[in-house]
Amino acid sequence: IRYLVRSRGLGDVYKRQNTNRFLANLSAEYKITDAISAKVTGGYDKSDAKTIALFSPEVAGINRVSGNGQGTYGTFDQTNKLFEATLSYNKQFENSKIDVVAGYSYQEFAREGINAGGIGFGPDMGLAASQLEDQYDLIANTISGSFQNFAYDQDRDYVNRIDFGAPFDSAFVSEPIGTSYSQLFTAYFANTFDNTDELQSYFARVNYTLADKYLFTGTFRADGSSTFGPENQYGYFPSGAFAWQIHEEDFIGDNVSTLKLRLGAGVVGNQEGLGYANFIRRTRFSDIGITDNLTVTNSGTQFVGNNNEALQWESTLDVNIGVDFGFNNDRFNGSFNLYRKETTDLLLLSTLAAPQVPGIETIFQNLTDGKVVNQGVELALNYDFVQTEDFTFSSSFNVAYNHNEVLDTDRIIDTGPINGNGLTGAFAQRLQAGYPLFSFYMAEFTGFDENGNPTYVDVDGNGEGDPDADKKFVGEDAQPDWTAGLSLNATYKNFDFAAYFNGQFGFSVYNATDNAFFNAGGITIAKNVTTDVLTSGEAPGSSVAVSTRFLEKGDFVRLQTLSVGYNVPMSGEGLFDSLLSLIHISEPTRPY
C-alpha cells in the first residue's frame, strides 16, 4: 500500500494505492516409455490494483475544486492464464543423441476495471475516500444486467449499456438508472472497461548431437494472436542452429577449456504494443466526465480504432555467427558474436492524412514495402583475477556496437509527436529510407538575434531560417550505437562486494519538457522556468518550435547496482546456518 500526502496542508491532497497479486504454477509429467514423456503445465497470475485520489474542498486556485471536494476512484484487475502441453522424445545412441519436443500453448490476458469520479464532499478526506468506492457499489448493485457506464448529478441520472444480441441500430441503450439509491456527491460518474487478448501457439524443436562435438537444432513455431484480424492471426517462425565444440577435438591443447563455433538463423515474430483490437473500427459509448458547472457530461456513441484487417505480425530474420572461448578451466572466458537482423512488416503507429474517424488521427500499420536492418558485433569477457581461500576477485565486461538503418521503402512517416502550448501537430522524428529508425528531423537552432528571437539554419536557400520550412535530418537518432557493462565481484572472508556499471553512447534525447515549459514564454504566464532561461537572451514572446535547441546528448555511464554484505556465522543446526546483513543500492532508471 502506498500513501502520498502533499500540498499546503496535510489534508489538502490525498492518494492511496493498494495492489494485490497472486501467482500459482502447477505441472505434471508422465513417463510413457523410457524415451517418451508427456508434460502439462498450468499457470495463473491474478493482480488487482485500487487507487483513490482526492482534492480537499479547502484547496484554492484549482478549477471547480475550491469549495467542492473532488476525487477519483479506479480499479485495474488483470488475470493471465497459461496452459501448455508437451510431448518429448529423448534417445541416446552409440555415438549420438536426439531430443525432440512438440507442444501446444494457450495464454489468455484479461483486463477489466473502473474509472470513476465524484465532486462535492466535505473536508473529511477519509470519509470521502470510502464514499467514492461505496457509491460505485451502491449504484452498480441496483442496475440489472451488464453496463458500460453510469452517472448522476442534481438534475438527472442515466446508465448506458450495449445489447450485443440486438441489431446495431437498437443495441445502444441509454436510460435512467430507475431504482432508488443514496447520492453521496453533487455529481458522480463511473466508466468501465473489459477486454481480453489471447495467444495460441504450436511449436516443435529437434536437437541432435553427434560425437559430443557437433550440435544441430531446428525449431518451428506457429503463433496465433487475437490482436490481428481473422485472416492474419497466425505467423510462422522457423529457425535453425549449428554448433561445433572444437575443444573436444584432439588437436586442441589442454589449456583451452572451451572453444565453440556457433551459427544460427531464425525468424522471430512481434506483436507488442498493439493494444486491444486495433485492427477494426468498433462502436461504444464515450466516457463520462464532470463539467465546471458540476454536472455530468452527455455520453453518446463513438468509434474506437480504425479498420485495418491487413495488420499482421512483425517478423525479424536474425542471422548470426559467434565463438565461445575459455582458458585454464574457464578462468578467463568470453564470447564474440556478429549478427544481422532484418525486420519486415514493421509495426508502427502512424498519423493519418485523412482520418477514417473524426478525432482518431493515428493507426497501427505494417511497413510492408521496406525493412529495418540492425547489424553489429558483441563482445563479452570474464576473468577471475584472484582465487584464494580468503579472497576472491572477478570481473565481467561486455560491449556491443549496433548500426540501424531503414531500407527499401518510398514512404516518409513523421513520428515522435511533441505536445505543449503552440506545438499542435509538432513532431521531432521522421522514418525514411537511408536513415536510422527514430532519426531526428527538425530545424537546426543557431541562437537568438538582437531582439531575442530564435534563429535557424536556412535550408531552402530563401535567405531566412524558418523552423517549419527548414527542417532537415540533423544527424542524430534515439538509438545508442554503443552499449557497455562492467561488473565487479569480490569476497574477503565473510564479506562480499558487488558493483555493476552500464552505459550507452551515440544517441540523443529530445527534451520535450524544456520545449513545452522551460522557455521565456513561461515568464509571461507566471510559470516557473529554469534559471538559464533568464540569461539566455530569449524574448518572452519568441517561438518555441521543435528544433535542435532542445536536442540533447543521451550518453551516460551509471552505477546501477552496489551491494555490500556480511555473512554472520551461527553455530548449531538451527533453522538458519547464516545471517546475511546486506546493504543494497540500485538505480533502475536512466539518469535523465
Give the residues covered by each predicted segment:
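Extracellular/periplasmic, surface-exposed regions of secreted and cell-surface proteins
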Residues: S7-F55, S66-R430, K493, L551-S586, ...
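Extracytoplasmic gating/loop element in the C-terminal half of outer-membrane beta-barrel translocons
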Residues: I62, A187-D194, S225, N451, ...
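Conserved active-site-proximal loop/helix segments of enzymes involved in bacterial cell-wall
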Residues: L348-L352, G465-P467, F518
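C-terminal beta-signal and terminal closure region of outer-membrane beta-barrel proteins
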Residues: L367-N374, N421-N453, A520-T548, S586, ...
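Acidic carboxylate motifs that coordinate Ca2+ or other divalent cations, activating on Asp/Glu
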Residues: N462
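Aromatic-residue-lined binding/catalytic grooves and analogous aromatic/hydrophobic interfacial grooves
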Residues: G475
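Glycine-rich, aromatic-lined ligand/substrate-binding cores of catalytic
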Residues: A478-V509
